[in-house]
């Protein structure tokens, strides 16, 4: 599933074609994706102008002049194909699926804009979805009401992290993936941020808060590394694993900078460390970490 940097890359690729443009025609090639389309979906979109294309965690939101916002979630395999009248692609931010996964038979939604651009949503697995809600109700709608803080926002700092994690015995990695606390983090970038911070993924999350609730020293380090990893990944155009590449056909490059993710048996890249990358399973997901410099304290 695409994580925050990939979704942000997609947003940046879609914005030049969509923002300020009027939706001329919407073609639905099936009645549903993961969920059924909203009532009169195409009709409510046609004739509207996109005022802004934003991101909330792993969601995209297109704010329309009708007072509604289009919510887009890419699921596991969703991608957008953006084409200009001359047939060229916009960049950066699209999904690339190997073989038949990216074929036209999986083109489910086609949005034609009055400026001549066409945006096609392709989703082989159909785990993505689209919804329409009143813009004024975005933060309280069912998709966003329980979401936590944005990890790249100024709101996420060491004191807030300490307050969120205080007295929690939940493993640190699981707490970071809890979208009710911090919205937008995923498996790849949590593994990378924990390694950079020298924190074991199974450490109780409450260890980042002192008994009085103030942040432990490592809380500041972790916040800094979360922001650094995400910022670097966005700048690199995301990470290409199996499903992701940029809309100009180039793949995202951050995977070349992975320190631990999917690198079992490789030497730890931390200067002076002689350890190797190991793997454990937490919550049904693979966790990658250095067995030497990310040590779980003995209690």
From Swiss-Prot:
Gene Ontology molecular function terms on file: 8-oxo-7,8-dihydroguanine DNA N-glycosylase activity; class I DNA-(apurinic or apyrimidinic site) endonuclease activity; damaged DNA binding; zinc ion binding
Q: Which reaction does it catalyse?
A: Hydrolysis of DNA containing ring-opened 7-methylguanine residues, releasing 2,6-diamino-4-hydroxy-5-(N-methyl)formamidopyrimidine; 2'-deoxyribonucleotide-(2'-deoxyribose 5'-phosphate)-2'-deoxyribonucleotide-DNA = a 3'-end 2'-deoxyribonucleotide-(2,3-dehydro-2,3-deoxyribose 5'-phosphate)-DNA + a 5'-end 5'-phospho-2'-deoxyribonucleoside-DNA + H(+)
Residues at the active site: 2 (schiff-base intermediate with dna), 3 (proton donor), 58 (proton donor), 285 (proton donor)
**Alphabetical GO biological process terms:** base-excision repair
| Alphabetical UniProt keywords | DNA damage, DNA repair, DNA-binding, Glycosidase, Hydrolase, Lyase, Metal-binding, Multifunctional enzyme, Zinc, Zinc-finger
> What is its cofactor?
Zn(2+)
The record's family statement is: Belongs to the FPG family.
Oligomeric form and interacting partners: Monomer.
Q: What does this protein do?
A: Involved in base excision repair of DNA damaged by oxidation or by mutagenic agents. Acts as a DNA glycosylase that recognizes and removes damaged bases. Has a preference for oxidized purines, such as 7,8-dihydro-8-oxoguanine (8-oxoG). Has AP (apurinic/apyrimidinic) lyase activity and introduces nicks in the DNA strand. Cleaves the DNA backbone by beta-delta elimination to generate a single-strand break at the site of the removed base with both 3'- and 5'-phosphates.
Record NCBIfam families: fpg, PRK01103.1
Which protein, by its recorded name, is this? Formamidopyrimidine-DNA glycosylase
From which organism does this entry originate? Methylorubrum extorquens (strain CM4 / NCIMB 13688) (Methylobacterium extorquens)
């Amino acid at each position: 599933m695409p994580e925050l940097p990939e979704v942000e890359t997609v947003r940046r690729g879609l914005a030049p074609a969509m923002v300020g443009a009027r939706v001329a025609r919407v073609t639905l090639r099936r009645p549903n994706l993961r969920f059924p389309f909203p009532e009169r979906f195409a009709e409510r979109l046609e004739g509207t102008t996109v005022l802004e294309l934003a991101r909330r965690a792993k969601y995209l939101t297109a704010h329309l002049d009708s007072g509604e916002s289009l919510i887009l979630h890419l699921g596991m395999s969703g991608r957008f194909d953006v084409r200009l009248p001359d047939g060229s692609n916009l960049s950066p931010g699209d999904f690339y699926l190997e073989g038949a996964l990216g074929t036209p038979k999986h083109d489910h939604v086609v949005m034609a804009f009055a400026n001549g651009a066409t945006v096609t949503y392709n989703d082989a697995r159909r785990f993505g979805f689209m919804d329409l809600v009143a813009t004024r109700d975005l933060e309280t709608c069912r998709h966003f009401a329980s979401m936590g803080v944005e990890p790249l926002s100024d709101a996420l700092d060491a004191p807030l992290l300490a307050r969120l994690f205080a007295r929690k015995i939940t493993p640190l990695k699981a707490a970071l993936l809890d979208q009710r606390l911090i919205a937008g983090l995923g498996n790849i970038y949590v593994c990378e941020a924990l390694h950079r911070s020298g924190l074991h993924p199974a450490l109780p999350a409450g260890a980042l808060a002192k008994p009085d609730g103030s942040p432990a020293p490592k809380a500041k380090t972790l916040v800094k590394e979360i922001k650094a990893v995400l910022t670097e990944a966005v700048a690199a155009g995301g990470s290409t694993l199996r499903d992701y590449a940029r809309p100009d056909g180039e793949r995202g490059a951050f995977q070349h900078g992975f320190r631990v993710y999917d690198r079992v048996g490789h030497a730890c890249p931390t200067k002076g460390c002689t350890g190797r990358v190991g793997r454990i399973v937490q919550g049904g997901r693979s966790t990658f970490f250095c067995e030497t410099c990310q040590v779980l304290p003995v209690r």
